[in-house]
A protein has these predicted regions:
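Bacterial N-terminal signal peptides
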Residues: 8-18
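Bacterial N-terminal signal peptides that target proteins for export
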Residues: 1-8
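Predominantly soluble domains enriched in secretory-pathway, periplasmic, or organellar proteins
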Residues: 22-393
């Protein structure tokens, strides 16, 4: 066999192997030690979560994190070439270049930020916005150079203010960023509003109450997301303490939002609604509740009024959720801030093609004394680099 033909055959075999490897469902899970462990540890695990894989539930590799970072959430930029990791314990934002292997954490100093929570990136991939719940501000950053460029703050008694910001959503088509007012980190005070910013400038425009109860309602709006493909734009909001789901509709003429309640989790004996997730089409909405641990499925055909369809059991602390690429499986990370009673530590696996049947749970981290804080699917260009890497635990 000629060297050229041998090289061609080798390439074909390599591509075939890579293709098979890329069929895996790989996920990023940042985790920390459960309370009471003799040695505290934090890391990002890359795990195979495909129920049909021989490596189901196995950790394939890890990226160590500082043990005192208290890494919280993982977010991607628009083309998923970067991952950002927020931190509750230090005024740092970490970024990982997903196009380079091995993966390297780079710390971005954000000295004005205490208790970094959520991050969004502008549609042109040039600016990120980071909510800082402890310092009651939003940091705008250059998403190319990854440096902070502006600190946005506005204190009460101003009519428009930023207080304990947690959730954040962006819509560059209307030049707006919305942030929720959640809770003071020590839980001594609770917010009840959403604040609207001008995305291009960071100007604080307006603040809106998210509760039908008299103030102080202490509703704690926590997460906010724009419903995909909605025209005019619609946001959905979860209130952690009040246990409700809200919507906000953009009025193009008035250039403002109006907000109203669309669901109450109380009658279903659920509390602490947290994260939201949409399918690609945008006609399905998933909302997790930490107590006692459920995923609520809605028909989101009309995002102005999502219709509740079913509640699927997860585990205490049901928090972040991801869909498999074909949207057959739903994976729910069950842990909230290492809090007692709502930090199960597992990942619930749900088969949506079978009416929301719970197939079981991934207890890999839980069994080792860890709690996952977030789950995100690994971008495809990442997966190809793991075809020969197996450091299973």
């Amino acid at each position: 066999m000629t060297p050229l033909r041998l090289l061609s055959l080798t390439c074909v075999l390599l591509l075939s192997t890579t293709s098979l490897a890329s069929a895996e469902i790989l996920a990023l899970l940042n985790y920390e030690s459960k309370p009471g462990q003799p040695v505290r540890r934090e890391a990002i695990a890359i795990m195979d979560i495909d129920p049909e894989s021989a490596d189901f539930g196995k950790i394939l590799m890890e990226v160590p994190l500082p043990s005192d970072l208290v890494a919280h959430h993982i977010f991607f930029n628009r083309d998923r070439t970067k991952a950002y990791i927020t931190a509750l314990g230090k005024p740092l934002l970490h970024v990982v270049d997903l196009t380079r292997f091995p993966y390297r954490l780079r710390a971005i100093a954000v000295p004005d930020c205490q208790v970094g929570e959520d991050l969004v990136v502008s549609e042109d991939n040039r600016t990120w916005y980071l909510t800082c719940m402890g310092s009651s501000n939003v940091i705008m950053g250059d998403a190319v150079r990854d440096v902070p460029i502006k600190t946005v703050s506005a204190a009460e008694p101003a009519a428009a203010f930023i207080l304990y910001p947690h959730g954040i959503a962006i819509h560059n088509g209307i030049d707006r960023v919305l942030v929720t007012s959640s809770v003071k980190p020590d839980m001594s005070d609770v917010g009840e509003s959403v604040t609207v910013l001008e995305a291009s400038t960071g100007n604080v425009l307006s603040t809106h109450k998210i509760s039908m109860k008299p103030s102080p309602a202490k509703s704690a709006p926590v997460e906010i997301m724009f419903s995909p493909h909605a025209n005019p734009p619609v946001v959905h909001i979860t209130t952690m303490m009040e246990g409700t789901l809200w919507a906000g509709i953009w009025d193009p003429k008035a250039q403002s939002f109006s907000f109203y309640q669309v669901d109450d989790f109380g009658p279903r004996q659920q509390g602490m609604p947290l994260e939201m997730l949409y399918n690609k089409k945008g006609d399905r909405l998933y909302v997790t509740t930490a107590k006692p641990g459920f995923v609520n499925l809605y028909d989101n055909t009309d995002p102005r009024q999502p219709k509740f369809l079913q509640a699927i059991p997860a585990a205490p602390g049901a928090h972040h959720a991801v869909l498999s690429p074909d949207e057959r499986y739903l994976f729910v990370q069950n842990s909230l801030l290492n809090l007692e009673g709502i930090s199960d530590g597992s990942v619930t696996v749900i088969d949506l093609s079978k009416g929301g049947k719970v197939l079981g749970s991934i207890d890999t981290l839980k069994a080792q004394g860890f709690n996952p804080n977030c789950i995100m699917l690994l971008p495809n260009h990442f997966q190809l680099q793991h075809s020969t890497l197996r450091v299973s635990r």
